[in-house]
């Protein structure tokens, strides 16, 4: 992709560990995990971490989690707040500050064969995706550290961890 000068290429995969997902994880270095702020989404996170660790050991040692994006967030519910807190506790700074709110426009857009940004660029959901994209582009690379396994850390945190190791 470097020949085309892309900064990012997103490969959307199902959460199950099928052939498509294994091949995608073998072809990339970074994984961004969207997590719905719902109860059952948390159950799959542990399995996903195990799968990433397994692929790192067997196929792609460079594979790591560089971002987690909280989606379908509903600030009116305790559940969304609890899921967000648990995800932030497990993944730390790799979780983006911007969240994608539950939105009718985000739900409607695929039915029209469009992204929410094309369907309704001024909607809350579209603006949230813009904000998340800006955050990704400006926060710097989150690379794995030997002490963090498959979870990336900011360059500042990596430097602190290196100092602690010395």
Task: Tell me the role of every PLM-derived stretch.
Residues 2-104:
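Conserved catalytic-core segment of NTP-binding enzymes
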Residues 57, 61-166:
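C-terminal lobe/tail of nucleotide-utilizing enzymes
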């Amino acid at each position: 992709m470097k020949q085309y000068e892309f900064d990012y290429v997103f490969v959307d995969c199902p959460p199950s560990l099928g052939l498509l997902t294994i091949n995608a994880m073998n072809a990339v270095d970074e994984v961004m995990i969207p997590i719905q702020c719902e109860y059952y989404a948390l159950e799959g996170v542990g399995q996903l971490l195990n799968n990433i660790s397994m692929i790192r050991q067997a196929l792609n040692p460079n594979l790591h989690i560089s971002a987690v994006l909280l989606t379908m967030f509903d600030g009116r519910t305790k559940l969304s707040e609890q899921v967000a807190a648990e995800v932030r506790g497990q993944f730390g700074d790799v979780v983006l500050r911007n969240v994608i709110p539950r939105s009718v426009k985000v739900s409607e857009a695929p039915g029209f064969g469009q992204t929410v940004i094309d369907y309704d660029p001024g909607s809350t959901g579209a603006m949230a995706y813009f904000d998340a994209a800006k955050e990704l582009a400006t926060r710097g690379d989150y690379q794995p550290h030997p002490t963090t396994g498959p979870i990336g850390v900011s360059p500042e945190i990596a430097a602190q961890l290196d100092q602690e190791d010395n």
